[in-house]
Amino acid sequence: AIAGCVPINLTGGVGTLTPEMLGFSTFVAHDEYGYKMQQYFANISGDIVELPGGMMSFAAGLEHRVESGFDSPDALINSGNTTGNARTATEGQYSLNEAYLELAVPLLKDVFLAESLELSLATRYSDYSNFGSTTNNKIGFKWKPIDTLLVRGNWSEGFRAPSINELYQGVSDSYPQVTDPCSTTVYNTLNADQKAVCTSQGVQVGGYEQSNPQILTQVGGSLTLTPETSESSTLGFVWSPTQNFDISLDWWKIDIENTITAYGAQFIMDQCVVEGVDNFCTLFSRGPGGEIDSLLSTNL
C-alpha cells in the first residue's frame, strides 16, 4: 500500500468520499516548457553601378542564431502512472551561422523587344552545428518584350534542417484506431504475398480476431533525421490588355528530397503488409496470438 493513501469505498454511496480519499484519486499536473531564440544579424544594401536598364543594387548580410527548447512533463505523466497518456521530456538546441548576397541587375529598358529586362541573383551559405554547411542559390528574371506582356521565371535551391521538436521530441502515447490487414476482417482480401507477410509475423493462416482496434502508438522525434533539400522552377506570363485587367499563367515544379514527416499508424501497417515495404514492418510488434502489441511512429 502507498503510505498515507486512504482507499475509496466505491459502494459507500453519495457523500462518503472524503478529501483524504480524493487526494489520492486525482492530481494537479505541473508541466514546464519553453522556447528560446538568440539572434544577431547585420545587413547592408545599396546601389552599385548604372546599367542600361537602371541602377544595379545589392543586399548582403550575416546572421548568427541559437535555438533551444524544452518540454518537461509532470513526473507522474513522465512515468506513465496516470490514467492519461504518458509523455517523456523533450530538450535540445542547435546554432546556425549564415551569410547571404542578393543582386538586382536591370539589363535593358525601353529598347526593341525589351521594355524591361531584369535579372535577380541570390546565394546563401548556412553552417549548422548539427548538420554541417550548405550553399543554396537562386536565379530569376522578368522580361517585358512589349508593354502589355510580362514573362517571368525562377530557379532556386532549398534547404530545411529538422526542428528541435522533430529531432528531440520525447515519446508520447496515443491510441489511434487501426485496422490490421492481418485480421479476419481484411485477411481474405489479401493476395498470397500479402498473406505470407502476415504468416512471417506469427499470424495464423486465416488471420486473427482483432478485438481492440485502438493500438498503443508511441510518437516521438528522431535523431537520425537529415535535412530536407529541394529544387524548384517556375515559368509564367502576365498579359495586361487593359489597365484594370490581367491574365496570368504559371508553370511550376518542385522536387523535395528527404521529406520529414511522421507517418500515421494505419499508413505504417498498410505499407508493411499491403505494399510489402520491409522498413515499416520494424515499427511495430505482435503478441503470441498475432495481435499488435505496440507501434512506433517517429519522424522519418
Question: What is each residue range found by the language model?
Answer:
Residues 58-72, 93-146, 230-232:
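Surface-exposed extracellular loop regions of Gram-negative outer-membrane beta-barrel proteins
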